[in-house]
Amino acid sequence: MGAALTILVDLIEGLAEVSTLTGLSAEAILSGEALAALDGEITALTLEGVMSSETALATMGISEEVYGFVSTVPVFVSRTAGAIWLMQTVQGASTISLGIQRYLHNEEVPTVNRNMALIPWRDPALLDIYFPGVNQFAHALNVVHDWGHGLLHSVGRYVWQMVVQETQHRLEGAVRELTVRQTHTFLDGLARLLENTRWVVSNAPQSAIDAINRGASSASSGYSSLSDYYRQLGLNPPQRRALFNRIEGSMGNGGPTPAAHIQDESGEVIKFYQAQVVSHQRVTPDWMLPLILGLYGDITPTWATVIEEDGPQKKKRRL
């Protein structure tokens, strides 16, 4: 009885859906009038030779599943009604026979729990019969619901680890390249600074000794203080004008520079010679070349030999 009720519920739901899709009433579908009307229209379109039955259904906006449902429902309802009438008849006869037996035979009251829940049996393949492919779809949904969350978690964790590792490698490479580039830039700037710097071979100790000797000799002279006194005296205006005129005349005529404009050098200035050909090439003296190449990370074979010679000498093996 439970299976029959389940089938009736499914039938009512199907009737509602088909009635909504096609616009046909449920009474017309159950009585077979809808099927007769559809068959008449299909026959009219087919006899004209314009299209086939499938094309006619598509033209009317009705799918083959809906047409099959409309054609099956009247037969199913008629058979179900006959089966229900037969079941009622059998049930009535059974009830009569049961009453006669209870009257004739004294039976004890059963001790089974009268409040026990009854579950209607349903064929697992019933839904797949009416709706092909439903069981496979439900199985796929159950599978995804069971392990889909774990799969997404594992895939997300793997992707996150890959992103972190790749980002770490990229950052390490970028920092390493930036450090090397900045180091090379600094060393290149230092090398160019050394090339363009004014180099002087200083003789400061000798200058200090000469100054001390000059001080000692001046102290020994009796008239040094007097000469210094007259030398430090200021010039009167006529003498100052005459001195300025001589200085300007000598400087304008390309004469020698007065001693007051000559700066005492603390050493010997090293002169650098540029390349003869205008090729914008860098020129470095031989004595500075090992230093410049060392800043760029290259050591000439000659300098390597010098380093080996200046290093600790190995003891010669006696023969």
From Swiss-Prot:
Assigned GO CC terms: host cell; host cell endoplasmic reticulum membrane; host cell nucleus; membrane; viral capsid
Motif segment (Nuclear localization signal): 311-319
GO BP field: symbiont entry into host cell; viral penetration into host nucleus
Coiled coil: none
GO molecular function ontology, one term from the record: DNA binding
Region (DNA-binding): 306-319
Residues passing through the membrane, by range: 287-307
Pfam families: Polyoma_coat2 (PF00761)
Keyword annotations: Capsid protein, DNA-binding, Host endoplasmic reticulum, Host membrane, Host nucleus, Late protein, Lipoprotein, Membrane, Myristate, Transmembrane, Transmembrane helix, Viral penetration into host nucleus, Virion, Virus entry into host cell
Covalent lipid sites (N-myristoyl glycine): 2
D1: annotated segments: 266-301
Family in the record: Belongs to the polyomaviruses capsid protein VP2 family.
Protein name: Minor capsid protein VP2
